[in-house]
Every structure is written in C-alpha cells, then in structure tokens.
Amino acid sequence: MKIKNSLKSLKTRHRENRLVRRKGRVYIINKLNPRFKARQG
C-alpha cells in the first residue's frame, strides 16, 4: 500500500479505483488490481 499526501493523482491511475473513508482516513481501493491500494497520510 502506498501512503501519499494527495490521492488525486493516484485515483486516476486505474478506472476501478474507489475513494473510501474509513476511521477518519482516506483510502483508494481497487478490487480488480490490489496493487493500486493507497492511503492518505
């Protein structure tokens, strides 16, 4: 999982990327290709 300050550029890397908020943190998840997972931090 990548940890980035800004997820905007990571969101556009794959069309299946979804932006979700969990426990006050922002994540990008991708069920088809899990290598695109990222967390804002």
Swiss-Prot record:
One of the protein's GO biological processes: translation
GO CC term, one of those recorded: ribosome
Official protein name in the record: Large ribosomal subunit protein bL36
Record Pfam families: Ribosomal_L36 (PF00444)
Keyword Metal-binding appears in the UniProt entry: no
Species whose genome carries this gene: Rhizobium meliloti (strain 1021)
Keywords carried by this UniProt record: Ribonucleoprotein, Ribosomal protein
Protein family according to the UniProt entry: Belongs to the bacterial ribosomal protein bL36 family.
GO molecular function: structural constituent of ribosome
Keyword NADP set for record: no
PANTHER family: 50S RIBOSOMAL PROTEIN L36 2 (PTHR47781), LARGE RIBOSOMAL SUBUNIT PROTEIN BL36B (PTHR47781:SF1)
